[in-house]
Regions:
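Proline-centered loop/turn at the N-terminus of a beta-strand
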Residues: 2, 53-55, 80, 93, ...
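Core catalytic region of metal-dependent phosphoesterases/phosphodiesterases
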Residues: 6-89, 188
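Catalytic metal-binding/acid-base residues of hydrolase active sites
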Residues: 10, 30-31, 60-62, 86, ...
Length: 202
């Protein structure tokens, strides 16, 4: 299965040339301000892509998914929006979650420690592909000043989950791929459309 992944398009999705594949996935920050109008534009663009399956989660900029969830989800008809949910496509299990450790006053914030650990405990063991908006600690999480800002609790859950691949964005400065146990860990940020989509063969 060929996966084509992006994150952090921030409304600049039309700048991207999207490769062919079986599954297109967006790991959040579809928009800049998270309005319903901005989400509608992204949804229309995604529906026009030729991929058989299209998955999306929200990011910290995508406020409407948190403030007006019913209206936001309705815009993504014909696409698969995941919010602490699982879907199986062609026998492959995908799980998506938008939450991140508390970050200023953005959307989908959860306090570090027990609160966010409870979020990650919902991820079923044995999913094949995990999609979160933010990174685990120490992998694809280094910001411009060298600080690591990923989630320690998410990192701790990766071995239990045992996914073949974990996609995320959020940190524009640390795009790349790493191996953590059995899991291929991928920061697929496009940094507002400046970087290409990431392609992974599962």
């Amino acid at each position: 299965m060929k996966l084509v992944a992006v994150a952090d398009t921030h409304g600049e999705h039309c700048r991207l040339t999207i490769p062919d594949g079986d599954v297109f996935l967006h790991a959040g920050d579809l928009t800049e301000r998270g309005t319903l109008e901005q989400l509608a534009d992204v949804a229309e663009w995604m529906r026009a892509l030729p991929h058989r399956h299209k998955l999306v989660i929200a990011g910290n900029h995508d406020f409407a998914f948190e403030r007006k969830p019913k209206e936001a989800r309705a815009l993504f008809h014909g696409l698969t929006y995941l919010e602490d949910e699982e879907v199986t496509l062609d026998g492959v299990r995908f799980y998506g979650s938008p939450w991140q450790p508390w970050f200023h006053s953005w959307a989908f914030n959860v306090r570090r420690g027990p609160a966010i650990d409870a979020v990650w405990r919902k991820i079923p063991a044995g999913v094949d592909v995990l999609i979160t908006h933010g990174p685990p600690m120490g992998l694809g999480d280094k910001v411009w000043d060298g600080e690591r800002v990923g989630c320690e609790d998410l990192l701790r859950h990766l071995p239990r989950v045992g996914a073949k691949a974990h996609f995320f964005g959020h940190i524009h400065e640390d795009r790349g791929e790493w191996q953590h146990g059995v899991t291929r860990v991928v920061n697929c940020t496009t940094s507002e459309g400046e970087l290409p989509a990431t392609v992974v063969e599962l």
